[in-house]
UniProtKB/Swiss-Prot annotation:
Membrane topology value: Multi-pass membrane protein
Sequence intervals crossing the membrane: 18-38, 45-65, 76-96, 99-119, 121-141, 161-181, 219-239, 255-275, 290-310
Main location as per UniProt: membrane
Gene name linked to the record: lsrC
Protein name as annotated: Autoinducer 2 import system permease protein LsrC
Length: 360
């Protein structure tokens, strides 16, 4: 049992390494099936396909670290994609149109944070409501129609330049490094972990937990806006169901990478690797020529499997730790020694009486 506990604790403390090993193992497996699969071009192609999910995983990580969850990111992604598309078709420049989308995403995330922190609405309930709100607003703006005829400037953002990586791909890599340093190396970043691990304790330490949570939701909205811009630049048009179902994949990517649903545990790198692994699984389905509707099924199955596996092992480890902790307080009953005879049950001899007792 001790070896089992140590093995699980090693896996739990090295979820990034576990996800990386899974990615490499999948590459090796597919390399055996198709030798052309194992090359740098395949790696960059999967990274390009994973950019939207990576951005959503970064935002979801910040929210989940504070022990919250946001299921409206798919709708925010669609709303921001519509915003940038409508602004471009209205004659605004690319930079200004992207700024509009980022402000819309930040505003949507900020509103989610207000609902959770100030109005004390549970995050899952609040964001379920805004999921429908933002989706409905998106359809109202477009009239249920697709946005087409986007300028070439937007599409150039996803055109490969250096090492087969697009400008927005390089921007995402810089963003990954910056967010990893922010959360892992700064006092402000550690405030997210403290807020999710022990809310009352963080408040007693002087951390402004409400501001931290609002900031997390706002940054989640910004990441969703960037994902919407990437989506529009990659395919060149905006369908009326843009972003639908992305929230589940974002949460699954974070859980695969070691982000705890209970808050306070995980890293950005782990979430990125989880997003890459999910996208790699999608590419495997394409290679195996399976229908596209298998993607959501596989993503849901992987998420459910990880949650069940993680929960069962966590309970087993906690039970074993409790047994070891309280084992030293358990005293074993001492068996009576049959060879030692007690003198308490012997009848008093005549020699034991005093003179006074004899006189009486």
């Amino acid at each position: 049992m001790l070896k089992f506990t140590q093995s699980y604790q090693f896996i739990q403390n090295n979820r990034e390494g576990t996800a990386l090993l899974a990615i490499l193992a999948l590459f090796a497996l597919l390399g055996v099936i198709d030798r052309n699969y194992f090359n740098l071009q395949t790696f960059t192609m999967i990274f390009s396909s994973a950019q939207i999910l990576i951005l959503l995983a970064i935002g979801a990580t910040m929210v989940m670290l504070t022990r919250n969850i946001d299921v409206s990111v798919g709708s925010i992604t669609g709303l921001c994609a519509v915003t940038v598309g409508m602004a471009l078709n209205a004659g605004f420049g690319l930079a200004l149109s992207c700024l509009f989308a980022l402000l819309v995403g930040m505003g949507a995330g900020f509103f989610n944070g207000i609902l959770v922190t100030w109005l004390r609405i549970p995050a899952i309930v609040a964001t379920l409501g805004t999921l429908g709100l933002y989706r409905g607003l998106m359809l109202l703006l477009t009239g249920g129609k697709w946005i087409e005829g986007l300028p070439a400037d937007l599409k150039s953002l996803s055109t490969p330049i250096l090492f087969s990586i697009s400008p927005i791909g390089w921007l995402i890599m810089l963003l990954i490094v910056a967010m990893a340093l922010l959360l892992g190396k700064t006092a402000f970043g550690r405030s997210f972990y403290a807020t999710g691990d022990n809310l009352q304790g963080a408040r007693q330490l002087g951390i402004r937990t409400d501001s931290i949570r609002i900031f997390a939701f706002s940054m989640n909205g910004v990441m969703a806006a960037l994902a919407g811009i990437v989506f529009a630049s990659q395919i060149g048009f905006i369908p009326n169901q843009t972003g639908s179902g992305l929230e589940m994949k974002a949460i699954a990517a974070c859980v695969l990478g070691g982000i705890s649903l209970l808050g306070g545990t995980g890293t950005i790198i782990g979430a990125i690797l989880g997003a890459y692994l999910l996208t790699q699984i999608d590419s495997v389905l394409v290679l195996l020529r399976l229908p596209a509707w298998w993607n959501d099924f596989i993503a849901g199955l992987v998420l459910l499997g990880v949650l069940v596996f993680d929960g069962r092992l966590r309970c087993a480890v906690e039970r074993n730790i409790r047994q070891q902790k309280y084992a030293r307080f358990t005293t074993r009953p001492v068996a009576p020694d049959k060879k030692v005879k007690s003198n308490n049950n012997k009848a008093p001899s005549s020699k034991s009486f005093t003179k006074k007792e004899v006189v009486r």
